């Protein structure tokens, strides 16, 4: 494993093409005009978009082409592009000016390449058709989960973690999270003034399917009066008690921040019905804010409204932190490819970026520890 490096520190120059694992992944005559040490690498972005994706692509292309002389091929719309043979060569010119842009120039989708029988063979065939030496896969738990399975089947893959939810277990932080928290905090700050002016409660629904990191951090930063997260089923009676306590103290408004995946203690209030599911089997979440609005108003008699931040958390320009972290992940990924360190993922561990195995990266989700949520409780009510 290479030595760790800080967010502003480049790795020592690896010797391209010398790794035995790289050599093993390329059969003789794999592609016409092959030059030892020069690779042809595919890159894709899968799952929900988030700020910082373009910074990763830019770093992969800039260092891959400028420093190593590799050819970089981008697949359109994630794994769908691999299955549908939708690819284009990425050049230095094609990544100019994309650093501050949100979204992804490659497009994305929630396509599961292994959903149907024959998916593995289709991926292998596409790599052969494009004469690729390997793939850099940028994604969250589902996209990287598919990458880990492909890697275990012998497909040469290096991963880059991406999710605004910050819930990948293999890394301390994912890019996009910082931007999402800033967007949510700005919204909470604005909603405070209108809530106070009209003496009403406001429920702010933020993203977070399995983990409440966005809700917790934006709620703390925005001075929320109640924060509800997926890791801790909530008691609606306790939520109402906290709001009533504020009113008894002359504070005739409250901000309730709730993650979309938060659920009540079983049997304490109505819940959402079955939602449609994506190709990875996850339900499309959303709606807990509206249910809370109804329950709080009907139980307390206080006017309550809901604001669902939704996809605004994914959009727009990334923060400086996310640009730097995404850039370092991209640089680490192209180094890993050049060194033949297949089956790994760039990860932030403490202050430094290093490589972890894909298997380790997707083994478990990174959720909010109970003690961290309990510490925040001192600000509730």
Annotated model-derived regions:
Residues 22-34, 82-137, 142-143, 175-186, ...:
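Glycine-rich oxoanion-binding loops at beta->alpha junctions
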Residues 34-83:
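N-terminal phosphate-binding or glycine-rich loops at protein starts, especially the Walker A/P-loop
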Residues 40-48, 104-109, 134-137, 202-205, ...:
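Short glycine-rich or small-residue beta-strand-to-loop segments that form or flank ligand, phosphate
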Residues 46-49, 75-81, 110-111, 140-142, ...:
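Short, ordered loop/turn segments at secondary-structure junctions
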Residues 55-60, 141-155, 215:
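Short Gly/Thr/Asp-enriched flexible loops that form oxyanion-binding sites at enzyme active sites
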Residues 69-73, 150-183, 228-235:
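Short, acidic/small-residue loops that bind anionic groups at enzyme active sites
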Residues 137-139, 147-149, 177-201, 205-302:
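Accessory alpha-helical/coil subdomains and C-terminal extensions
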Residues 280, 284-381:
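C-terminal non-catalytic interaction/assembly regions of soluble proteins
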């Amino acid at each position: 494993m290479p030595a760790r490096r800080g967010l502003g520190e480049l790795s020592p120059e690896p010797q391209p093409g010398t790794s035995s694992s790289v050599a093993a992944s390329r059969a003789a005559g794999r592609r016409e005009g092959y030059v030892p040490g020069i690779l042809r690498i595919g890159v894709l972005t899968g799952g929900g978009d988030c700020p910082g994706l373009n910074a990763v692509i830019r770093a992969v292309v800039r260092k891959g082409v400028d420093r190593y002389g590799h050819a970089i091929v981008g697949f359109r719309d994630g794994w769908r592009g691999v299955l549908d043979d939708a690819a284009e060569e990425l050049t230095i010119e094609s990544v100019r000016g994309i650093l501050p842009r949100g979204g992804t120039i490659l497009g994305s989708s929630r396509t599961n390449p292994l959903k149907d029988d024959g998916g593995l063979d289709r991926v292998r065939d596409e790599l052969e058709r494009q004469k690729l030496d390997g793939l850099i896969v940028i994604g969250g738990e589902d996209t990287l989960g598919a990458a880990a399975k492909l890697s275990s089947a012998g497909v040469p893959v290096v991963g880059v973690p991406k999710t605004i939810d910050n819930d990948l277990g293999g890394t301390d932080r994912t890019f996009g999270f910082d931007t999402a928290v800033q967007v949510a905090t700005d919204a909470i700050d604005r909603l405070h003034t209108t809530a106070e002016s009209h003496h009403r409660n406001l429920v702010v629904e933020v993203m977070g399917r399995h983990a409440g990191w966005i809700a917790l951090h934006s709620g703390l930063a925005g001075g929320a009066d109640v924060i509800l997260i997926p890791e801790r089923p909530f008691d609606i009676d306790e939520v109402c008690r906290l709001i009533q306590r504020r009113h008894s103290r002359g504070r005739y408004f409250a901000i309730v921040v709730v993650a979309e995946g938060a659920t009540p203690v079983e049997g304490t209030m109505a819940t959402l019905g079955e939602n449609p599911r994506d190709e990875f089997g996850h339900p499309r979440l959303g709606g807990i804010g509206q249910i809370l609005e109804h329950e709080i108003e009907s139980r307390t008699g206080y006017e309550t409204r809901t604001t669902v931040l939704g996809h605004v958390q994914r959009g727009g320009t990334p923060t400086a932190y996310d640009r730097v972290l995404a850039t370092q992940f991209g640089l680490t990924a192209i180094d890993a490819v050049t060194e033949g360190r297949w089956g790994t993922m760039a990860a932030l561990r403490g202050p430094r970026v290093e490589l972890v195995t894909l298997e380790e990266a997707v083994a478990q989700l990174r959720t909010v520890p109970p003690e961290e949520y309990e510490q925040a409780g001192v600000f509730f009510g």
